């Protein structure tokens, strides 16, 4: 008997939406990354993108535990000498709350071209309005 190998044409991707209201950031991002990778499916294949599309609503209402709301710092580098920049969790939540969830989920996905294609299936919105109604997403309780 031959081993089953999934083909790109056989992959079925569904659309789901989740509500981030009063969810803990790390646990929430972990559950989303599993869905984006497709590890919840029987036909999961490590070298293929078998995951679903995820729409995250109410990103502005996400929670963090402890003192992370004040103390957590996000770093990035501009590429120039002395170009390290830092922003606190509170500052990012005021500017763009969706960015916090995107950073957390992106760190939990594989690095490389496969991870980038998985990350493109994540759509994050800071409120309840989204522009993917035509895809008829189903509610997913995380």
Swiss-Prot record:
Keywords: Ribonucleoprotein, Ribosomal protein
Signal sequence annotation: none
Ribosomal protein recorded as keyword: yes
Gene Ontology MF, one: structural constituent of ribosome
Pfam families named among the record's database cross-references: Ribosomal_L13
One GO term describing the cellular component: cytosolic large ribosomal subunit
Domain of life of the native organism: Bacteria
Gene Ontology BP annotations: negative regulation of translation; translation
Matches recorded under InterPro entries: Ribosomal_uL13, Ribosomal_uL13_bac-type, Ribosomal_uL13_CS, Ribosomal_uL13_sf
Ribosomal protein in keyword set: yes
Stated family: Belongs to the universal ribosomal protein uL13 family.
Record's subunit section: Part of the 50S ribosomal subunit.
Function recorded in the entry: This protein is one of the early assembly proteins of the 50S ribosomal subunit, although it is not seen to bind rRNA by itself. It is important during the early stages of 50S assembly.
Protein name per the record: Large ribosomal subunit protein uL13
Species this chain originates from: Buchnera aphidicola subsp. Schizaphis graminum (strain Sg)
Taxonomic lineage from the root: Bacteria, Pseudomonadati, Pseudomonadota, Gammaproteobacteria, Enterobacterales
């Amino acid at each position: 008997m031959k081993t089953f190998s999934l083909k790109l044409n056989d992959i079925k991707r569904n659309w789901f939406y989740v509500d981030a209201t009063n969810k803990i950031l790390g646990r929430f991002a972990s559950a989303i990354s599993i869905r984006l990778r497709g590890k919840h499916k029987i036909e999961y294949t490590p070298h293929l993108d078998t995951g679903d599309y995820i729409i995250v609503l109410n990103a502005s209402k996400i929670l963090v535990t402890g003192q992370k709301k004040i103390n957590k710092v996000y770093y990035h580098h501009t590429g120039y000498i002395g170009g390290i920049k830092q922003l606190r969790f509170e500052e990012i939540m005021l500017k763009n709350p969706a960015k916090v969830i995107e950073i957390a989920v992106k760190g939990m996905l594989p690095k490389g071209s496969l991870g980038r294609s998985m990350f493109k299936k994540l759509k994050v919105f800071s409120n309840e309005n989204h522009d993917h109604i035509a895809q008829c997403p189903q509610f997913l309780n995380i």
